């Protein structure tokens, strides 16, 4: 009996969550719980010898993104050993290259695409509606994918983890530390959807105070 593709994808999703926790400095207890769950989902893979290929599109070399990718690879390798192989591609901070990479993964027929950062996720979603996609280092999926009435679940073939910070608490911290402040400067990149989203949320929170 071979492990089902669904079981592999379930284990990969849990490994992705564990990797995101590691990259963001998450608790060891949460990571341990994720590891236990992924072990249960993947226990029969090594014995049955089913082979899987994961395409990884990472936007750019960056310490946090590198850690998320490495943690994801390490976690899946720990569960599946030689039964999983990775095709890692770095887009060199270019959205067009992300699209080229994603289309290449689709042509190659990979079993799963791990999209590391928002442009990588956007490119992967545009490239396929059938190959499962796991996003990481993505702040807000609704904004990144242009979803209306986003309720926290993307649906379809896209899932993943979010690195969204507690923006309301950050606004509270500003007013607590600087109660007399009347003007607050917010640095962000207007070309990046998640950056725009965060500054809008913080601005709205500060205007209420």
Could you describe each region identified by the protein language model?
Residues 54, 58, 72, 159-206:
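An alpha-beta-alpha
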Residues 151-161:
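Rossmann-fold dehydrogenase core element
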Residues 24-38:
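Bacterial lipoprotein signal-peptidase II cleavage site
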Residues 64, 68-72, 97-101, 116-120, ...:
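Stable alpha-helical elements in mature extracytoplasmic
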Residues 39-52:
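N-terminal low-complexity, Pro/Thr/Ser-rich intrinsically disordered segments
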């Amino acid at each position: 009996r071979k492990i089902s593709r669904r079981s592999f994808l379930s284990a990969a999703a849990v490994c992705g969550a564990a990797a995101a926790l590691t990259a963001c400095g998450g608790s060891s207890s949460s990571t341990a719980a994720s590891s236990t769950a992924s072990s249960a989902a993947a226990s029969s893979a090594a014995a049955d010898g089913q082979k899987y290929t994961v395409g990884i599109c990472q936007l750019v070399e960056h310490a946090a993104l590198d850690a998320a990718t490495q943690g994801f690879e390490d976690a899946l390798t720990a569960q599946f050993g030689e039964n999983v192989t990775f095709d890692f591609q770095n887009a060199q901070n270019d959205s067009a290259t992300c699209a080229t990479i994603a289309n290449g993964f689709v042509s190659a027929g990979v079993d799963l695409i791990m999209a590391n950062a928002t442009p990588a996720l956007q490119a992967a979603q545009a490239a396929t509606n059938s190959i499962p996609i796991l996003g990481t280092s993505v702040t807000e999926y609704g904004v990144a994918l242009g979803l209306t009435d986003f309720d926290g679940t993307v649906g379809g073939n896209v899932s993943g983890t979010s690195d969204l910070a507690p923006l309301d608490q950050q606004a509270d911290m500003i007013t607590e530390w600087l109660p007399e402040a009347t003007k607050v400067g917010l640095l962000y990149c207007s070309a990046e959807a998640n950056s725009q989203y965060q500054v809008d949320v913080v601005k709205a929170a500060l205007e209420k105070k």
